[in-house]
Amino acid sequence: MRVRVAVIGAGSMGMNHLRVLKDFDEERVQLVGVAETHEPTLKHAMSRFHVAGYTDYRLMIEQTHPDLVAVVVPTHLHSEVALNVLDRGINVLIEKPITRTIEEALALLQIASIRGARIAVGHVERFNPAVVELKRQLLYGALGQMFHLHARRIGPFPPRIRDVGVTLDLASHDIDVMRYVADAEVEHVYAQTQRRVHSTCEDLLLGLLRFTNDVIGVLDVNWLTPTKIRELTITGEKGMFLINYLTQEVYFYVNDYTPTTWDTLRSLTGVSEGTMIRLKVQKAEPLQLEYQDVITAIVDDRLPTVSGEDGLAVLRIVQQLAESTQQGVYAGQQPSVAVEVEV
């Protein structure tokens, strides 16, 4: 089966989608059209990728009959565009976050169920080879009991992001990965945010997540740091994993502690610095792997790895982080105290 794919949105991320789709074997994937309201941007995409272009995505869908539509538009348009596509019974890949609000996401899930269409959400870090290898190691028991997750997703302010802050735009990546590697849901959150550079939205988030299996996650996310860092550490009884999303590297720092029957000595030890191991990772482009998964899901008639339900779960946690921030005590009042919110 050859899957016909159309893309809505030809901005910075949309161009990445078009590039990846063009790299597929045409016997498996056919790029049938791109829709973009800004005509100079549309013409550039048409010229570069030799694809039919439309200023009206509805007309594109009517004329190209796609099996899958990638929704790569600003977040505030996700709901409107995806709802229109799903109502036609067409599968969608929605760039993260799934929508701005839980109500919008629930509406998408409902129409998808009614029309028999699939929703995939572009939490692309799930397909990062470093995350894939990390999950494989965890399934093998390399870490033992998991204690703690710490995500650092920091870097300069991107002017192209105008309609959302770091919690929805950046932290959603790490929330999704944490749910995946912890293999548990979040039950409590606490957060603090600040707005320093962005004109309307928060550009700094510090958040705590407590999972149902008692693992604690830390989110350190901002658009204020003059260098780009994308890292996750996972600490457990046998050591600590460190993954670098940008370089797709995975390191394991072994806890060299050797159990002993001497209770007094045991109370003084428990963790000891050991060997650092660099794991072998086959590097690949996460977006391409994401498309491979979504296309295979269509052909095999199964759910994609990152489903609409996953997107909704992440959005619920994002909302809880926002509510936690709002319940804190602000400037001019008494020092802020921790507010724990049940998810």
Give each language-model segment a name.
Residues 1-48:
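N-terminal Rossmann-like dinucleotide-binding module
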Residues 55, 94, 119-121, 243:
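Hydrophobic residues in well-ordered beta-strands that form the structural core
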Residues 175-253, 281-302, 321, 337-343:
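Contiguous beta-strand/loop segments that form the cofactor/metal-binding neighborhood of enzyme cores
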Residues 122-129, 157-188, 202-203, 290, ...:
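Mid-domain beta-loop-alpha active-site segment that forms a flexible
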Residues 68-70, 293-343:
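C-terminal helix-rich "cap/oligomerization" subdomain common to oxidoreductases
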Residues 17, 51-110:
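Beta-loop-alpha module in the N-terminal Rossmann-like domain of NAD(P)-dependent dehydrogenases
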Residues 99-161:
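A contiguous active-site-proximal alpha/beta segment in oxidoreductase catalytic domains
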